[in-house]
Amino acid sequence: PVSASANFYSLGTHAHKLACFVTGLGIRELAADVSRLVPGRKLDDNAHILLRFENGARGMLWSSQVAPGNENGLRLRVYGEKAGLEWSQEHPNQLRFSPVGQPPRVLSRGGPSLGPAASRATRIPSGHPEGYLEGFANLYRDLAEQIRARRAKRKPDPAALLVPTVEDGAHGVKFIHAAVESSAKNGAWVVLTA
């Protein structure tokens, strides 16, 4: 059985956090197949995970270091009753929005149809590449706002509270441990502890 997780610690935690953040849902339980596909590797390099969210929604997560042609390849797809969303880190300025019964639309970063939170995260005019480094700048800005608010004994700007917390990090570690446990039990469903 897999006793530690290299691929999943470095890649899967990001996909896990992204799915929970975008949907606003926590994961209740999972069933995982964490494996070593490259002969001689001591730690995993591939994981397939089935997810059950707290509202009953289903999901799946694939995390791999053995998928040639993918440059990091972090991608999120969310489907609901009214629409689907698709985002890829390899094309971070675009969000594919597919309402049921309508043609899909591509929403661009900095475009007029975006809400306040998306506009706040945009640092440079649309048409210019933006993403990875600016994402860190947004985190630092929001953390600085929280620190300033605490020192001034005031409430921070609500938009600055969207940054990951220590609790989010702890939940990510629990997610990894549950996936490793599930895989060691041949993909049995494991309940995530709160």
Map each language-model feature to its residues.
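C-terminal hydrophobic helical "lid"/dimerization subdomain
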Residues: 170-183
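C-terminal glycine/acidic-rich active-site capping loop/insertion
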Residues: 21, 29, 48-53, 82-163
